[in-house]
Each structure stands twice: as C-alpha cells, then as structure tokens.
Amino acid sequence: MTVSLDWENLGFSYMKLPYRYLAHYRNGAWEKGELTEDATLHLSESSPSLHYGQQAFEGLKAYRTKDGSVQLFRPDQNAKRLQRTADRLLMPQVPTDMFVDACKAVVKANEEYVPPYGTGATLYLRPLLIGIGDIIGVKPADEYIFTIFAMPVGNYFKGGLVPTNFLIQDEYDRAAPHGTGAAKVGGNYAASMFPGKIAHDRNFSDVIYLDPATHTKIEEVGSANFFGITANNEFVTPLSPSILPSITKYSLLYLAEHRLGMTPIEGDVFINDLDRFVEAGACGTAAVISPIGGVQHGYDFHVFYSETEVGPVTRKLYDELTGIQFGDVEAPEGWIVKVD
C-alpha cells in the first residue's frame, strides 16, 4: 500500500519520511546500526565534518516494478564508491554488506513511499558518512556517523527527458587537478554552487565544466557526467582523474556496447571538436539521462541533435536503462537487488 501523493509532479526535493538508518563508528569499529524516527543528527560543534569537510555521501534509488515488488539498482557499486571516497578522506569504510542491508532496511521501512509503477517516480536514498567528535585542527575524526534517509522524487531536471541547454564554464572549476574530483565529497558541490547560479540566472539547466589544467576538454556536467554519440555509432565519455566515476555512466557504457552494438570510448572530449557528436547528454543517478540540446561557450552556441527533440540513440539508451531499473527489461547479472 502506498500513501497518496501527486506522484507524477514530485520534482526533486526533500521530504521527511518516517524512518532512516543510523550507525556509529567508535573505538575503531562500527556499532550495530538501527532504524530511527529521529531525523536530527546529534554531533559536537567541533566535528571535523562541519569545519574541514570530512564528509562523504552517495545517491541511489529504489524502483517499484509492474508486479508491485521493489528493487535497488547496483547498490554494491555505490558502496564501493563510498569506500573509495572514505579512503581519500581518511574515514572508515562502510562494508558493502552493511551498506546494502541498510539501504534495503530503509526502503522496507518506508515502502509505502515507494512511488507506484508507471509514474516515473522513484524512492531516492541518500547515504551520508560524516566525521564527528571533539576535534579542532585539520585531522581525521575518531568517531563517525553513517546514516541513510529516503524521499520520493520525480525528475531532477524540470520536464524530464527533454533537451535543455547548458553553459560551458571556463572561469570556474569544479575540482582541482589531483584533488577530490573523483570522490563524492560535499566540497566539490559547494564549489559548484556559484557557477551553477550563473548558469541558472541565464536560463541554462546547468554548467559544463572543463578540465582544470588546460580548460580545453569537457569533464563534468554539474552533478552529472557528459556523454556524446557520434555518427560512427560510438558512445563517448570523458576520462579524467578529476571526474566522479558515475555508476549510471558505466552502466550506459555497458549497455551501449552489449545491447545497442555501439563502440564505447572513454577519452578526451575537446571543446573544439563538438561537431563529432550528433547527440549529447548528461547522465547520473538523479538525472538518469538529460539530453543536451545545445551548449553556450562564450559567444558561440552549438546545437547537437535538436533543442526540442530527443535523439534516437539517447532515447534507446534511456529506455533500456530505465527498463532494467523498473524491471521491464532483463538486467545484466548482479545489477538488481530485490528488497524482500
């Protein structure tokens, strides 16, 4: 049974649900986590997560299938990415089994908020790992909190699967060379807020960031990854140590090759070579796929497939991926975890 909400017009915003998961790391080990109705985190005013940004987060979704069951999409990959981020920030890893079991517990406890099949809406999960305790000085915490909360969401970008325009930004960088760009840390997103506002004020959906070293290559699209489709049936995505490795992107790389017969390519995407792409888009957990109609760079505006219509290959990839996520298309082995 589900609650009564306007599922098809949810948007992407916070909603307080009855239950979330909470676990503490103390004395060198994780304590047993539990579900709680308390949506407030209790931590010291001197916690390193507040002062020095020792925090990491993830994002994944639960999907209602046609038969009414609920499933998660590749949660083990989110666990592994959080572990890599934790290593980068000197935080304890959350074991994969603990992570996946906690996700399943949160979904099960809030199952009435998993949107009905056919609405296009999903239950978004936000795992969060933060350093807490009485610490002053730039050093790792002794204690940590791992928590997961959930909320039903619609489309991240207004309008869903429709082309929108993006602003190529070469005055601001998302991450520094050899910095934390490949980790999912809050500081990367804080740095993107100001250039993001510039783009939104100019009626662009988001920012496309260039490589911080030369400003000649595309890296990320705001909070998503960039991809391009060539006339030679290639699926191309940027490759850089300062790009967050997107689970959605790597899923699309696999599907492009094994389901659509395309050639997957990870490599440099130069801004002076955009004519090679007949279609382009942004992809990520929140956005899924957002077709890019055109991009503004300085005084130049470049259109890919169309500013009003979704390209045929982008549509096929979207249908294949969402079909797997909602249980309508057979998934590659290990991609789907059922919530019992």
What is each PLM-predicted segment?
Residues 1-102, 106, 128, 135-340:
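Helix-start/capping segments and mature chain N-termini
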Residues 96-97, 106-120:
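Charged, gly/pro-rich active-site loop segments
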Residues 116-130:
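Extended, Lys/Arg-enriched charged tracts that mediate electrostatic binding to polyanionic substrates
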